[in-house]
Amino acid sequence: MTRRGLAAACAGLVGVALAVVALPQAGAPAEMILGTPPNYGPAAISEVPNAAAITRRIWMPGLEDGYNAQGLAVAGGSVLVAAYRSDSPDVRRGPCRVFRVDSTTGSATAQVDVPSPCGHAGGLAIADRRLYLADTRTLFMADLDGMFDGPPPRFRTIPLGPGVTGALAVSEMEAIWLGTYREDGPGRLFRFMTAALDRLADGTVLNASDAASQIAIPSHAQGAAIDTAGRLWVARSTLRWGELDRLDVTSGKVEREYQAPPGIEGIAFDAAGRLWAVSEAGARHYYDSWRGLVLPFYPLIFALDPAKLK
């Protein structure tokens, strides 16, 4: 039986399950969202916390092809989103792709495939005009200029050593941060200077000892970004809930906590101070299974006004 068939067969059981599991409520209709909607899912996205702080919504590209959004970075008037492709809810790795999206119109303007061994594309960062893509055990880097407009870019790969995991990435002017994802306790965020990364010989492993600094970050960390005041923001989530934490970048102390859309992944600030984010809630390989009957549907790129968060 196909996943859609299984979902249909389970529909009769859902009425009983509703006594225990509440289905996500509908939020904004599809016509209020920029970009191209997928041909699956409900007619409206799910209601989410802090919706009043959201100033723009864009459909994530590649949804129908099975791409699951992970890392995010901002490059001028474009939002870049890294994703992996999967057709099974139990498989969370696959071919990686970076999508470029116009932040004003919501149009997907270009895309670049990332070579093997990329399989999850957990983090995306920009520093010194280079794009860094953090995968579980490998850091990919390539020149950003002309990346989407010419021949396929040449990615340099840097293996990640013990303790350093590319679950998320943070952009700075002359540095990037790589973070670990943990569910059972705090993760860690490591700061690497781009000059030091440039000096690494091909094949040299990047170790925790190479970091200029490191701090602890909360559990379930999916993305992070630094605002103009130098404060660290961390996106935390599962497919059912989301949260934005504001931390002191030196001590790692959590200063504020805000509810956020479920499935929130990569985040980044633009020049205007808006916080851009992307959610994997509603990715096709989850929604084509029985999980689509109970999970929130919010497969969007969205911009937040931090001043409106409550």
Regions flagged by a language model, labelled:
Residues 2-62, 293-310:
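Sequence/structural signature of beta-propeller modules
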Residues 56-94:
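Beta-strand-rich domains and repeat architectures in extracellular enzymes and scaffolds
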Residues 74-76, 126-128, 171-173, 226-229, ...:
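Residue-level detector of Asp-centered blade-edge/turn motifs that repeat once per structural unit
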